[in-house]
Amino acid sequence: RDPATTVMTTAAASWSPQPEGLAELVELFRQSTSTEREVQRRIAHRLDAISQIPDYLNYLVLVFVQMTGEEVSTRSVAGLLAKNHLYFNAPRVSPESLAFVQHMILPALSFSDTVLRNVATQIIAVLMQVVKPVNWIDGLSTLTQAMDSSDLNEAEAALSTFAKISEDMPEELDACEIQGMRPLDVLIPKLLHATAHAD
């Protein structure tokens, strides 16, 4: 078993949210759809304060991936905040949090809702930029397999994610191997096939 996978699984298993903090965040995400300027200002101020806690990213990803009883709008806000937090604050994110996100995020590619799947592809693409493809071979391997999924939504989301990664970091992707093959050697024929069969 890949040692990185063991680390990710351990990180996911050993973390659990504080119920009060989780409840507050979910309520903030629910209110974030308000068009009232004062409500938006208060939410932004509170989220800015909460974002300083070390495991803030874990909470965001947990809400996005696991809180299936919440509205799509609530979960998508959490997901987009997770993507932005990763993008703008990567140096502040602990290895444990990165491992937690790596463990949690890939199943989101098979979400039935288009909005949530699109957010998942954005999170995974940014996460790959942060951790680098060579350090997340399991993630690349899962994406490669998902492109052949019988679930067309999952296959399309995986393909979209892979295309974004190859656009953002072609050299890093080209330096990797998955079972003896370069990811781009797998991706390019699939992209050509998808383009040929596009509606």
Model-derived features: where do they sit?
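Alpha-helical solenoid scaffolds in large eukaryotic transport, assembly, and signaling factors
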Residues: 9-111, 115, 119-140, 144, ...
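Tandem repeat protein-protein interaction scaffolds
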Residues: 192-193
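Short, Lys/Arg-enriched N-terminal segments with co-localized hydrophobic residues
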Residues: 1-7
